[in-house]
């Protein structure tokens, strides 16, 4: 009888990078000491993957949709809905959801799009104050997510989804006016303008910001709203398509939401924050535990992306080393003959760009049944030589499922 293996997909968010002078011309992944991933590279196979298509910078939402095997051009209906699912909200198809950043506004200019990366606890307290004190004449839900992130849901307003953002997407610029394309979205734009104004009044006087002022930290006195989203068009759940039980170990709301939308059970172990202070070993232990009961486990590690956005190459390398130790724990507790492991990023976040780019992402697959190549280390340049070649993100899961002996033959 053919062995049906388990699958473990590990995403190191924003993993891919470009050569950096500060790192002697290496990328953070090449600069980092990664004995466990290098061991897997030696016994596995490397390649590169374009989350969407070559040269196309991918959002974390569209990238994960693609990596889970979906066509984002067909399924994607905006980021906000995934954010809302990720914070545990069960929404209807009539609701309109948005991603929100707590930000710092000084003299009409956004000086910090993440309000000094305020903590999750601070964001949740500020969100509760806004929910309790702001009245805009329509039903809404405002809830803190991870770190500086929050979610806004306008109940019953899905027809106004053609509304723009007020986020200029870089510091040093004023907030944008909400654009709109029709009467429904014009109404939503007006509601959002009122919401932002009233929320700002609450934030300016909140004790958290009074304390941050005294401490010389950026205050969270403004809301940047983006990514209007309605119910995604998911034709078939991941679990139905592949006939597997699937679980995710995830801290970040957006990625939780994508996983929930396609049928994953989602777990967030204590100490897993999605921030620099996350407890990656708690994630490793949870993944090992879940592999006993689930056929396919997805583990998401966020901080590498944040270091790219913050242009901190040495920190990004250190975080990759932490992720490698996390992977080492997993390797000590699984039988590689019975598990197929894939490691990649959802996209590249080069430090010099401080944002997502269209660079391909290194990909490693190892475990039972995997053909090997001649690569010895996991890095961008080694990945170019790998036997997998250059594939698209949506090819990863089918390749894994085939190696797990869970794919069905096409044709007679």
Curated annotation (Swiss-Prot):
Family named by the database record: Belongs to the BPG-independent phosphoglycerate mutase family. A-PGAM subfamily.
Pathway field: Carbohydrate degradation; glycolysis; pyruvate from D-glyceraldehyde 3-phosphate: step 3/5
Highest taxon in the source lineage: Archaea
NCBIfam families cross-referenced by the UniProt entry: apgM, PRK04024.1
Keyword check for Isomerase: yes
Described purpose of this protein according to its UniProt entry: Catalyzes the interconversion of 2-phosphoglycerate and 3-phosphoglycerate.
Enzyme class: isomerase
UniProt KW keywords: Glycolysis, Isomerase
Keyword Ligase: no
Pfam families hit by this protein: Metalloenzyme, PhosphMutase
Entry's EC annotation: 5.4.2.12
Gene Ontology biological-process annotations: glycolytic process
CDD domains: iPGM_like (cd16011)
Catalyzed chemical reaction(s): (2R)-2-phosphoglycerate = (2R)-3-phosphoglycerate
GO MF term set: metal ion binding; phosphoglycerate mutase activity
Protein name, as recorded: 2,3-bisphosphoglycerate-independent phosphoglycerate mutase
InterPro entries: Alkaline_phosphatase_core_sf, ApgAM_prokaryotes, Metalloenzyme, Pglycerate_mutase_ApgM, Pglycerate_mutase_ApgM_sf
Species per Swiss-Prot/TrEMBL record: Pyrococcus horikoshii (strain ATCC 700860 / DSM 12428 / JCM 9974 / NBRC 100139 / OT-3)
